Amino acid sequence: MILSSDHHQNDLSSLLPKHVAIIMDGNGRWAKKRGKLRAFGHRAGIKAVRSAVSFSAKHNIESLTLYAFSSENWNRPEQEVSSLMELFIFALDSEIKSLHKHNIRLSVIGDIGRFSERLQDRIHRSVKLTANNTGLQLNIAANYGGRWDIVQSVQKIAQQIKDNSLEQQDITEELVNNYMNLSQQPQVDLVIRTGGEHRISNFLLWQIAYAEFYFTDILWPDFDENVFEGAINAFAKRERRFGGTIPDDADVGS
């Protein structure tokens, strides 16, 4: 059960994250433990995606961002990359009607121009179908990298300066943020990483500046609503400072 009975219902909105981002790690190791190829683990991970989406929708989380394919993943074996691309198409084809039925809005962030025309078409059609939905905002980060995101923002600002539509002294943190992916959504409150690793892996470098982190040894295909609930409960107990401090007389250990 999320939180305890000590919390009044009207306090829940301030304790629960509005935006959760997940680094879905461990598919390959999950498959290896079962004597299978990595592709088997990636396919098994779809069930965990369903669980994460369902949990988020049920608990009124506004945005869920899933790290599906990083810009560095192109360095994996060609057969695995090809399998991932086909799995992406399969997932879109099999899940989009359900997402639409449940009022979930889909967005894909990243440099999708490197994908095949077939995959790009599936992405555009899926995003268009759900564009007017008003429930959970589901973001899939595909061919995405945090550094790439910052660079593309800077490039757009540089073009404005070149076009004489922006003065250099007018560049602010807010302006840079406006050109970043997810800028129109709540800031990321909680980052969950499965698989036991404790690193960011070039994910949402700008957007997670004040996020809380939750690491679990659970491999992604085994991620379910109970694991998600544990992360949310841990988040609710955190003292978020956003770069500030707390009073010296506060009853804390730091």
Swiss-Prot record:
Q: Which cofactor does it need?
A: Mg(2+)
Give the keywords, sorted.
Cell shape, Cell wall biogenesis/degradation, Magnesium, Metal-binding, Peptidoglycan synthesis, Transferase
Subunit-level organization: Homodimer.
**Which HAMAP family is this protein grouped with?**
ISPT
- Its recorded name reads Ditrans,polycis-undecaprenyl-diphosphate synthase ((2E,6E)-farnesyl-diphosphate specific)
Q: Which reaction does it catalyse?
A: 8 isopentenyl diphosphate + (2E,6E)-farnesyl diphosphate = di-trans,octa-cis-undecaprenyl diphosphate + 8 diphosphate
Its annotated function is as follows: Catalyzes the sequential condensation of isopentenyl diphosphate (IPP) with (2E,6E)-farnesyl diphosphate (E,E-FPP) to yield (2Z,6Z,10Z,14Z,18Z,22Z,26Z,30Z,34E,38E)-undecaprenyl diphosphate (di-trans,octa-cis-UPP). UPP is the precursor of glycosyl carrier lipid in the biosynthesis of bacterial cell wall polysaccharide components such as peptidoglycan and lipopolysaccharide.
Q: Can you cite a GO biological process for this protein?
A: regulation of cell shape
NCBIfam families in the record: PRK10240.1 (NF007596), PRK14830.1 (NF011405), uppS (TIGR00055)
- Binding of substrate occurs at 26-30, 38, 42, 70-72, 74, 76, 193, 199-201
What are the positions of the active site? Answer: 25, 73 (proton acceptor)
PANTHER family membership: DEHYDRODOLICHYL DIPHOSPHATE SYNTHASE 2, DEHYDRODOLICHYL DIPHOSPHATE SYNTHASE FAMILY MEMBER
| Residue positions binding Mg(2+) | 25, 198, 212
Hey, which family's this protein in? Belongs to the UPP synthase family.
What is the enzyme's main class? transferase
- List its EC numbers: 2.5.1.31
Question: Which InterPro entries would you find in this protein's record?
Answer: UPP_synth-like, UPP_synth-like_CS, UPP_synth-like_sf
The coding gene here is: uppS
Co-factor binding details: Binds 2 magnesium ions per subunit.
